Amino acid sequence: MLLGWGCNVFRPPTSPLPSVSRYVRSNPAALDNNGQMFKLIVREELDMASADRPTLFINATILDGSEHMEPQPDMAVTVERGVITWMGPSAVAQAPAGAEVIDLAGAYLMPGLINMHVHLCGSGKPVSAGDAGALMKKLDNPVGRAIVRHILKGSAQQQLASGVTTVRGAGDPLFADLAVRDAIDAGKYQGPRLVAPGTGVTVPGGHGAGLFAQVANSPAEAAEQVRDLYARGADVIKLFVTGGVFDATEVGEPGVLRMPVEVAAAACKAAHEVGLPVMAHVESTEGVNAALQAGVDTIEHGAPLTPEIMELYRGAAGTQLEGRAPSVTCTISPALPFVLLDPEKTHSTDTQKKNGDIVCSGIIESARAALEAGVKVGLGTDSSCPFVTQYDMWREVAYFAKYVGVGNAFALHTATQVNAELLGLGGETGTIECGKAADILVTRENPLDDLCALRDPTHVMCRGDLVRKLKVKRIPGVDAELDAIMAMPAEALAEELTRDGVA
């Protein structure tokens, strides 16, 4: 699911609890009768590091997030009450009273990464989700919802520990992302800034139905679901306009249009009336056209573009949220393994493999064409898909440079300032400058030389809170396969697509 790849639901990388799917399947009565047969106590510990104490970083090499991002050596950055209040040469820096002084010894200080497409409900292990819809029904009770919140909390903290300071959710079960966002914002525990949709909106038989999307049977139902999400506190609306690789029954038809234009248009109209942007899962040219006509603000994933679609991207439809032009979110991470790894490893059929090739090619082609036409392109991982962990945003940045063909500076600029602007957060985060939130990532090596430097940050700060324990619980088997892909030359992708008759 998600990108059509299937979804590893509930395999949290950090949770001390057993996998929810494993727990429920081995204890089928555990969550019956509102969880009364088995009482599972979930403790959401308070692990917030205070932002009250000022911090002074000295001897930093600043990469500010701007497009050309010239390194600024021997610099200092002062953080007070969660905000960058001063920047200048380390030689003249003065620590505020009581400040913690951190000598970076020349390390590279940059804005925290922003991940534009995240499902927090899984770990990225390539396992079957099984009957996820039935599992959701068992979890829809007070104890089950507490378990889901605990898992999403762990995933959010994995994102943060890996250097991601802002996450835009793409739909998770049981509105749990809204609760996690509120807990983070209230200071109950550390986590990234979370732009949360609650659940998505789909149609009968559509992507995400019964898992992380509500089913709308008509335009009126879609509009009502959007209004309900707004009342619950959603920051963005997620639509599932097309199917994906695993929905297709024949080679050549991934991304079949599922949501009628009138349903998508009703959802967009209701969202825009209350100021909410709309993001949409789309994996076909037909779907992109329908979504943009309906008023969708960001196309997630993408597909090959026609001249008519390029005009819609430029805002010719006039139905997007006021003040915003439509954009595309590039998500290479879930597509690439299905092209470059053996089907035995991805658990895909021959039909799914070939349709995966089509979608992967379309995502890359869409990003290239959009950039050439001046359309904004953001970056996200589609975390929770097979082989897409909660700690690998750095890989998406590297894939963007490698396969779309942009420079390292532009890739990092996209993952910071551009993503912030696309979220409407450009005045708050995305660059290192006075007055903005202290969302900071530090690496030993220069990512402008090698984006793999982003893999192991030495310091992460979000809204002025320094993460004291950068613990990323890695999945060695997944990492090994992805490292092998990273080592392949860019030409390997084109060669594989050509072999399958796609390129």
Regions found by a protein language model. Give the residues of each.
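His/Asp/Glu-enriched, well-ordered alpha-helical/loop segment
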Residues: 273, 347-351, 361-446
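Active-site beta-loop-alpha junctions enriched in small/polar residues
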Residues: 119, 172, 199-201, 242, ...
